[in-house]
Amino acid sequence: MAAGFANLSTSMPLNESEAIVLRTYPFRESDLLVTLFTRTEGKVRGVARAAKKSRRRFGGALEPLTYIKVAYEDRERQELARLDSCEVLESPLTTEVSYPRAVALGHVAELLDELLPDREANDAVFRLALSVLACLRGDEFRIPLTYFELWMARLMGYLPDLSACLNCGRTLNGSRAYFHALADGLMCPEHKRLASSEISAESRRLADQMLRLPLSRLEVPQKSAPDLSKFVLQTLERHIEKKLVTRTMLERLK
């Protein structure tokens, strides 16, 4: 599936980087508009010339969530880079992509695309994405996705304190705690807002474990902690000021 590195132009030096393909869109008659999360420059948008007309040049390298080595050229006074060549390092298509797995992969892509700024490298997020994608091989995706959501909130600086009530400062420990779509943190029973949702002590302990251990060493709980995921996604949506499309799709898989 890998496409060789055949440079089409030597007019400007090529940038080379590891990258994760986030999205592709039809562009003009035969091109694709591609959003990449590169290791060296962060999120880069570029054009893959004739990618729709012939698969020989890029092969399967532009499938979403494919881990690639990419060569691209930045052009003066133009926002879009020109993709020169791609080499597949790891593809999600090497194992069966069921509908639940496709939704899970799409969720990772959407979070990366919505949360990351253009042209700003973030190696911690890049390593996080690779580790989570390695765990999304089958249909058991809830815990890896919650891990990814939680760490994205933390790395973006959006994750509030989970140990104390945001209103009174009371330590929550194992007591009951609540969250609300418009509140930036957790609340104790005495200071919760109307229409708040509860997050269990077990889910808060899981969050603490997730923030201390790599995903590969995480003790997988029997329950998937949907309350923790809901809390984190509400936090992220509040900061990006929009609803995540894949969140609704994931909820329908229950």
Predicted regions and their residues:
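Non-catalytic alpha-helical scaffolds and adjoining flexible linkers that form interface surfaces
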Residues: G4-K254
